[in-house]
């Protein structure tokens, strides 16, 4: 189970991020920074980076920095180890310009992250055999349509994990996006318009990633709370808009029945929780589209009061009431609710 959501901090937006980074109890949570974004370079660059890293370290963040050979020269350090010490870096993300031998040697001194999309299983095997701490990290993709496909992410992640590497990736933010495109910074293209908590759960449960960062500068407090709840309890928060009269179903823990079919989530406790019992009258017996929450009415006899979440479009049924709907940005969560696992419906603000 993942313990927390990592953050990304950008020098040009650091002052905008400072307040939330101060308010959040880091406790060793990871934060990603890049030290080779050319548009950030100016005469005060090194001093500004130093101040940012001093702050992050003092707040308890573990800093993972994206670096290049040029970074060493910019800061006037003898080598990457000296740079890491100066900037309080927990780990270094290395991309182009470093040999396998250099990466293995550096990994003996501090955690090293390599590019998960370009590192072959053979190279991963050699890195893992070196005995140091090596992580494979997927990129984020600012331009729409350039994010990874599901098949590639799943296959590359599994191949690297099979060789002994942990694999990290990125999800988009929702409160403050990164320019100049402001289109989200996900690893997976399908996550670009998704809610952060839904993308987080998808990477964790359906792709098996070992670490997840928000690529954009800010994630809303609400989404952070959904992620925190999942990380600490294993229970998914499912935002739902329920029709009037059904609000008592909010904030109750439900279990996906172990025998649920692929197209439906059957709520194991629904008839136990239901205050409607056999009195559920037909109401809003509409088409049951994916993301609809339904309740069987009296037409289904003893099934009256049973709740289901629709994962595959179904026709209208006079014996089934549509009582709510999951917002589109949380669609990914429907395929994260596994048989036998718990979740709770929460009210959207």
Label the model's feature ranges:
Residues 2-133, 140:
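Active-site beta->alpha loop and helix N-cap motifs at the rims of alpha/beta catalytic domains
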Residues 65-81, 99-104, 152-155, 205-214, ...:
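Electropositive, surface-exposed helix/loop patches at the edges of structured domains
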Residues 52-56, 75, 171-176, 266-273:
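A broad, low-specificity signal for short, low-complexity segments enriched in glycine/proline
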Residues 115-245:
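Catalytic alpha/beta core domains of metabolic enzymes, predominantly
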Residues 1-3, 348-349:
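Short, Lys/Arg-enriched, disordered terminal segments
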